[in-house]
Amino acid sequence: MTPKIRAPFLARRTYIKSLGALGLLGVTGVPVRGESFAQSVAPATLDPILPYDPRYTALIRGFNQRFEGDPSYIQLCASPQQVLQAVQSAVDAHLRITIRGGGHCYEDFVTNNDQGVLIDLSPLNAVYQENGLYCLEGGCTLWNVYTRLYKEYGVTIPAGSCYSVGVGGHIAGGGYGLLSRKYGLTVDYLAAVELVHVTKDGKAQLVTIRPNALNPAECDLFWAHQGGGGGNFGVVTKYWFKNLPIAPPVAYLTNIAWNWPELHQEQFSQLITNYGNFFAGHSAVDSPYKDLFTLLRVTHKAGQQIILTIQYVGDHPELIDQFVQAIAPQGIRYVSQPTSQDPHRLPQTPGTRKLSWLEATQILNGSGPNQRGKYKSAYMLRPFTAEQINVMWKFLTMSSYANPQALVLVDSYGCQVNAVSSTATAIPQRSAIMKLQYLTQWVMPEEDRIHLQWIRDFYTAMYGPPGPYPD
């Protein structure tokens, strides 16, 4: 079973758990100054989207098509002042509030708000620089952020690959992506957060919080936004960042695959073992492989191929071949032009491609079509055990469950991510070497039970009934 991550006891973690949604008692912050162009031209209010509005049925669903809500209304907000008004109106009416940025939430935490208020931040999406800091408004999506930061300032954030993910929840959860081994997590660059919260007497307030505030509660709240999750502490209207890294000038992309029909269990075990062992030995801050990021898509055999995607953004692209040689199992060839129909794969071009970083980021977009799905995650502190690899083989070769969209995605982790103390932010997994995502996707509602049972049985077999230790 996977070693469980047990973070040291932190009073701040208790603080996070003690806060209700939007109820941030004792936090005053500092006055909000200035406004973006989008705010200056936004109307005082936007009309709510009610159930009879033709847009309503489209907006009560997000990325995961399993979930459909029934809110009393959907309130679009194009400025922090509109968010402030929307929150106050909901509080006055005693309506539950949920928040949506990109709508990419995997579980039913957003649209599941029957007769409540869904605050949609998508119109609040400006990206700009002011007083030496970079501002991302709460409704931005990642592709919007990448293109604006790259084209206008030449910098980036080390966030995720899915273009449609909203920054509001993604950054509050840590902000991990393909540049994290090189640059760390997005929250490591966070300088301030502007948000709307509610006082104990029911008054909505728009405040800006910083890590060096005199008020300890404000410092704790800022810390919580560095990985404590989104939607729990208020409605984030702006993130401010300092010293963002320069975007890499080029990126080298390689895509290789192993054909399932040619793969025996011994070779499968060797591949998974070698992959884990490599990152156990190359996840230190000073690793020569810190510019290397990999995504191993260990698909169900119905998907025909196990696909490895490699991005390298350093000065020694020959390290790509060295990595492949280190992890490739013996006795089976890999193909350098995968033929899988996986919607997330790279275009079918053999060998390594040298691209601009922005073009590579666009190619590696992992959003795919909106479907029904179930997702689970875990972090690995050390390589897979033989027992775990046997469990993976069992569930990924199961003939009674043949879904080509079922897989385990094993991302490389560590290096600059782990340069930061596990107590400095609300991210405790600063010693992990791999990040796992178990997922299965499908289309038909009547198949829900089959797919949910498979992934739950798989996850339980990997970690035991309690699962990995959450904190």
Q: Where would I find each of the regions flagged by the language model?
A:
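Soluble FAD-dependent oxygen oxidases
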Residues: T2-R12, I16-D471
